[in-house]
Every structure is written in structure tokens, then in C-alpha cells.
């Protein structure tokens, strides 16, 4: 049915983070440090108790999670990648419990600077793949490189459809 007060936003609350619903070159998961609100153009994320927001955000920025986002999401005209709430739950992210919090914050700050300065997202993925997947979690560098190739192939396929 049509809302009686169509001009009112139906649900306003301050989330811990936002995951952009529709993306161009790569998906974006951002910490909400300024108590911003949003309509449903972005997924509003509220972390469970015991989940450290910085760990959650950093755990997303790697080749594995980007490849799974392309696999789980859907592609629309112009090469847009859309990720729905149910699809978000299918994206694999590494568990970073063993990574010291100072290191998490340091890496997240570097990723943030790359993104804010419109740098190449692959610089951020290189950093997190090397520092987290390889150095902390024991992935072989060749495996990370193969997974990056998978993400790039899926990304190119999506972008070329537009």
C-alpha cells in the first residue's frame, strides 16, 4: 500500500557501518564514524556485540572477499554491481582475531587513504593480501595472486557488459 505520509523516511537509525548496495569498479564497506544516516540506497550495518568494527571493515578489503562479492552479487546495465542483503551473508571474509588491534588500525588507515585519494584499489588489496592473508593467515602468495586474477576476470566481465 502507499504510505500515508510518503514524504517521511520510514526508518532512520545510526548504523555502525555502510555497505554500498550498488557499486562501479569495486564494492565499498565503510565505517560510520560521523553518525550518518541513510535510506536503503546503502546497507546499514549494525555489528553484534563483541565484533570490533575496524576488524570487520579491514577483513573485507582483500582479494578473496572481492571475488566472492562478484560471485554473490548481481550485475546490471552499465556494469553496476548490486549486492542485496541475503547475498552479503554469502561473502567470505577472513577472521582477524589474531591480528593485533594496532596493526588493524594502521592497515585500515592506509586502506582508507588509498580510497579517499581515489587511488587504485589494487594497492589496498596488495597491502591487505600481503600483510593479512599471507603474513598473518598463512596463505601462499601464489594463491592470493590466483584469487586476484579471478576477481579481476569477474570484474572485467561485469564492466564489459555495460
Which positions does each model-derived feature cover?
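Polybasic, glycine- and aromatic-enriched phosphate-binding surface used to engage nucleic acids
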Residues: 1-113
Amino acid at each position: 500500500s502507499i504510505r500515508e505520509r510518503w514524504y517521511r523516511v520510514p526508518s532512520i537509525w545510526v548504523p555502525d557501518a555502510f555497505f554500498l548496495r550498488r557499486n562501479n569498479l569495486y564494492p565499498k564497506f565503510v565505517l560510520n564514524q560521523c553518525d550518518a544516516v541513510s535510506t536503503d540506497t546503502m546497507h546499514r550495518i549494525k555489528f553484534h556485540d563483541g565484533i570490533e568494527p575496524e576488524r570487520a571493515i579491514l577483513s573485507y578489503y582483500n582479494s578473496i572477499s572481492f571475488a566472492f562479492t562478484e560471485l554473490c552479487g548481481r550485475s546490471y546495465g552499465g556494469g553496476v554491481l548490486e549486492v542485496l542483503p541475503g547475498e552479503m551473508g554469502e561473502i567470505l571474509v577472513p577472521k582477524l582475531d589474531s591480528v593485533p588491534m594496532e596493526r588493524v588500525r594502521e592497515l585500515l588507515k592506509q586502506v582508507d587513504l588509498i580510497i579517499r585519494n581515489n587511488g587504485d584499489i589494487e594497492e589496498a588489496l596488495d597491502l591487505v593480501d600481503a600483510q593479512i592473508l599471507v603474513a598473518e593467515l598463512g596463505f601462499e602468495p601464489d594463491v592470493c595472486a590466483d584469487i586476484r586474477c579471478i576477481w579481476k576476470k569477474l570484474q572485467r566481465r561485469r564492466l564489459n557488459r555495460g
